Amino acid sequence: MSDGTSNSTHFGFKTVEADKKADLVAGVFHSVAAKYDIMNDVMSFGIHRLWKRFTIETAGARPGMKVLDLAGGTGDLTAKFSRLVGDRGEVVLADINDSMLKVGRAKLRDLGVVGNVSYVQANAEALPFPDNHFDIITIAFGLRNVTDKDAALRSMQRVLKPGGKLLVLEFSKPQHEVMRKLYDLYSFKILPKMGEFIAQDAGSYEYLAESIRMHPDQDTLKGMMQDAGLEQVDYINMTDGVVALHRGYKF
């Protein structure tokens, strides 16, 4: 989604040319890739693992299924899906950022996750897969970084099989004022300092906090998924809406 013009969009709180955003986001993730897993644990106090576990459970992957872990980064979801779909299944870990893919591939191979996992560098707005290909698509903490979210959702809907399910796990909008104030304090005062201390990169974590605030709220994203052709769309708030899991189906 743009900020109201056809050739501009947001990068955090900044307005930039739409065709520049992907490179700017790439710079952020090239910078943070090596410390990404450590920072996730520290930033969320480990709660991100519970959010991802719930996403995996909600996905309902079974042996033999084809799963796309889009913006899959360092492979947390891919590792779990690989075990669930088994030897007859397939998991594709796709990410636009080659630094994140390299970290994810090395991590999963160290864990012994091989055989039914492949790695693809791909732009979510134009997925390089056939129509009606995947039983399940997940995108965890990635949609907010996409320039044209509507195009990405349409692309995901296209490559889902009829009966397939899309799950979007993303930071969202806290539901209560006290939580909103605490979350703002944490995001804008504490998080960048963590980024500087652990990853020597305060700027990238300032962007991440800003990108969360610019992401569509729960009901807006639900409407965007419906507009992309997904049906029976709903969402589940977690941690008072700090994170929401949206799900939709293709029939």
From Swiss-Prot:
Pathway(s) this gene product operates in, as recorded in its UniProt entry: Quinol/quinone metabolism; menaquinone biosynthesis; menaquinol from 1,4-dihydroxy-2-naphthoate: step 2/2; Cofactor biosynthesis; ubiquinone biosynthesis
Taxonomic superkingdom: Bacteria
Keywords: Menaquinone biosynthesis, Methyltransferase, S-adenosyl-L-methionine, Transferase, Ubiquinone biosynthesis
UniProt keyword annotation of Transmembrane present: no
One GO term of the biological process aspect: menaquinone biosynthetic process
Entry GO MF terms: 2-methoxy-6-polyprenyl-1,4-benzoquinol methyltransferase activity; demethylmenaquinone methyltransferase activity
Stored InterPro entries: SAM-dependent_MTases_sf, UbiE/COQ5_MeTrFase, UbiE/COQ5_MeTrFase_CS
Record has NADP as a keyword: no
Pfam families: Ubie_methyltran
Binding site for S-adenosyl-L-methionine: 74, 95, 123-124
E.C. number(s) listed in UniProt: 2.1.1.163, 2.1.1.201
Catalytic activity: a 2-demethylmenaquinol + S-adenosyl-L-methionine = a menaquinol + S-adenosyl-L-homocysteine + H(+); a 2-methoxy-6-(all-trans-polyprenyl)benzene-1,4-diol + S-adenosyl-L-methionine = a 5-methoxy-2-methyl-3-(all-trans-polyprenyl)benzene-1,4-diol + S-adenosyl-L-homocysteine + H(+)
NCBIfam families (UniProt xref): MenG_MenH_UbiE, PRK00216.1-1, PRK00216.1-5
PANTHER family: 2-METHOXY-6-POLYPRENYL-1,4-BENZOQUINOL METHYLASE, MITOCHONDRIAL, METHYLTRANSFERASE
Main function: Methyltransferase required for the conversion of demethylmenaquinol (DMKH2) to menaquinol (MKH2) and the conversion of 2-polyprenyl-6-methoxy-1,4-benzoquinol (DDMQH2) to 2-polyprenyl-3-methyl-6-methoxy-1,4-benzoquinol (DMQH2).
Family membership noted in the UniProt record: Belongs to the class I-like SAM-binding methyltransferase superfamily. MenG/UbiE family.
Protein name: Ubiquinone/menaquinone biosynthesis C-methyltransferase UbiE
Origin species: Shewanella amazonensis (strain ATCC BAA-1098 / SB2B)
